[in-house]
Amino acid sequence: MSVRGYSGVQVISSRKHRSMSRLPTVLLLLASAAVLAAGGQEATEDPFADETDQCQISVSAETMKSLHGGSMQPDGTCDNLWESFLSQFHQVRENLTACQERAAAGPAPDPSSQFCQQLLDDAQRQMEQEHRQYAATLEEQLHAAQQETQQEQEMKKALQKQLDALTDSRNALYIDLLLANIAIGETKQALSYYNLMPASMPIDKLHEQIVRFVYRVTIYQDQRLLNLMRFVRDIPSVEERRSLYQLAQREVQKRPSQRDGYVAAVYALSVREDLPVYQANRQLYDDLVRQSETRLKEQVANGNFKQAAELAARQPQHFRQLQTSLATIELKHWRKFDRFVPYANALPQPAQRLEVLRVLLSQIGDREKKTSHKYLVKAARQFDICEQFIGRGKVDQAVKKQLEELRGKFATFAKGKNYQHYLSESRKSSG
């Protein structure tokens, strides 16, 4: 069925278009028609304007009925029908707009959901509060633990400091006892304290301290050095012995009183007796021994017996290694015989004196066979002094036997002249 157009728009309802029955499509068409109608009304206001193009929309009767909820009258006028369409369209549009806004704003909360949400929020707040309280408690406990740990660390440091101080005091005491025993010659006791030194203590520093102590007091330095030599021999470590020997040698070389005296000889002979140390650098110690021996021989030849006598008294074992050499007068000093001959009785022990007399008589026989008289007279005088010295003490049979052998030696130089002859001559010359 065809209906007259409204404002340039025709709406045609025909049964042969029943296939177009979906509401969204019709609404779209109606919206388009409304726009076109508005434009058409504006155009018709001008009486001289050409007639606008008409838009024809075909709507089935079933669709029209569905739009009106089945209440549409088929015989209604087109204007009424169109007004009804527009009214319903606007209503639907408003409903759709409101629905869209509600959808965008979110669904309305359900009262039961609101209650559950409140419970959930309360539980969340309570959990957060408990969490804050628990975190605060843990923070306090952690702070207390840190303070306790710091206090314990401070106590530990204080105890360690006290322990270190006690250890230092103990080590200082050991060193003092070590040095004191070296000073008095108690080498075994000194070695026991030496072995108590901690491994953490640098051994070279300890050795330097020992040697400095030896030379701390000048009047005691010779005896302390001799004690040190005896102490060093008992140290098990070859390297430690070598270290102490080298430090001592430097000090000996600095001091003429030791370098030119018997102390240097004792030092060098001590090192030579220590084979592991001596073999490491023999030339160094051999040179020192020769230098010391040469100086002592020069002193004895010039009538200076002090150093040789001290060596014989303080280090008889070391003196024994040099006594024959010291008793032998070099040819260039033979003319100083008068100065040299009293050397025999400058020595402290009978065996040492007899050895000098033996070497002296042997040299007279080798050098002055034909002109021995004046030398034997002087030798007889020293023999008499030696015999009196031996008679005042207790001596073994070996010394007495050697004394008689030397007495008989005087008779071998000239026929009919014995010891008594030369002794009488010496008493005459001395007046």
Curated annotation (Swiss-Prot):
Any one of the GO CC terms: extracellular region
TM annotation in the entry: none
Entry keywords, A to Z: Coiled coil, Glycoprotein, Secreted, Signal
Parts forming coiled coils: 120-169
UniProt induction comment: Induced by blood feeding (at protein level).
Gene knockout outcome: (Microbial infection) RNAi-mediated knockdown results in fewer Plasmodium falciparum sporozoites invading mosquito salivary gland.
Glycosylation, residue list: N95
Note: Monoclonal antibodies against saglin/SG1f fed during blood meal inhibit Plasmodium yoelii sporozoite invasion of mosquito salivary glands. Monoclonal antibodies against saglin/SG1f fed during blood meal inhibit Plasmodium falciparum sporozoite invasion of mosquito salivary glands.
Quaternary data: Homodimer; disulfide-linked.
Free-text function comment from the UniProt entry: (Microbial infection) Facilitates invasion of mosquito salivary glands by Plasmodium yoelii sporozoites. (Microbial infection) Facilitates invasion of mosquito salivary glands by Plasmodium falciparum sporozoites.
Protein name: Saglin
Organismal lineage: Eukaryota, Metazoa, Ecdysozoa, Arthropoda, Hexapoda
Gene: SG1f
